[in-house]
Amino acid sequence: MDITAPAHVLVFRPLIALMRERGDEVEVTARDYAQTVQLLEQHGIEAELIGHHGGRSRIGKLATMVTRLSKLRRWARGRNFDAALAHGSHHLTLTARALGIPSSTTFDYEFATVQHQLGCRAATFVVVPDAIPPERLERYGVRPPKLRQYPGLKEEYYLSDFEPRESVLDELAVDRDRILVVVRTPPDVSLYHRKSNPLFPQVLTFLGSEDSVQAVVLPRTEEQRDYVRGLSLPSVTVPDGAVDAQSLIAFADLVVSAGGTMNREAAALGIPVYTTYGGRLGGVDEALIREGRLRPLTDPRALELVKRGSEGLRVRREPAEMLRLLMPV
């Protein structure tokens, strides 16, 4: 397994446990990016660290990819792997293809064109939610039987055994009398870059000046952390490092996220969630919006800042079914 982003740790945690319970040998590689290493440590997953993120520039990403592919091949060669699993890591599927190892990759956003052109064509199987129309994947060379689809959200599978820790509120000094808003930064490395999502700073400024609100902002990088802290907004809290984000979401009154994973975690846990994503919506988000489980946000003043009164509808699914679809052998 190759883990290249923080969310992948959560996806693979129950699958690793299931495989080891049945006697499989599992080895994990990881890329040093954002909170990936911290989350691996928190969940007790040992991994071989290989490479790092290439940053914003295409040249940097290409150079980093070439170097990491070479290191992955050297590491994997001669280890007699029977299968390789990835969540969107084209590094893994390309390496597996070069070494003749059956592989599968999964993702839930179909418009990451460059990544999917590489990863999908190299993979033996591609596993995606059934909310993604199959015809959108044909340009990546993905058709049945290579295509496998599952019902619901991947978050409904990996959160199936999750029970939130209320102590996370004390760890972050959350005032329970105020409206708790969990905010996830955009994927942009630089929040203040001219091409960055302009809505996100507006949301921060709006929430940060509301006395009735405590907004906990979860940055992706240290650069983002420094930027948000530098705004000195009175109602904004920025944790020092990786936190139990799923527990925080479970106790939140609402979630505002520019990324995909935290939106879907909130939806899976039945928490009101708004998306500020500025790109093209994928099939999963389109379905969630149709179902009323995700709300698009274009103006911060449209946020319903109220205490959540009742438990939302939580959906749990069986991780073993996800593992069955992912196994390429």
Please give the residue ranges for each predicted region.
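A conserved, positively charged/aromatic
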Residues: 104-106, 116-128, 249
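Conserved nucleotide-sugar phosphate-binding/catalytic loop shared by glycosyltransferases and other
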Residues: 20-64
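A donor-sugar binding/catalytic signature common to diverse glycosyltransferases
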Residues: 84-95, 105-106, 248-285
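Catalytic donor nucleotide-activated moiety binding site of glycosyltransferases and closely related
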Residues: 43-56, 204-239
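A nucleotide-sugar donor-handling region in carbohydrate enzymes
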Residues: 124-196
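Donor nucleotide-activated moiety binding/catalytic core segment of transferases
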Residues: 68-75, 222-262
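C-terminal amphipathic helix plus adjacent low-complexity
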Residues: 310-329
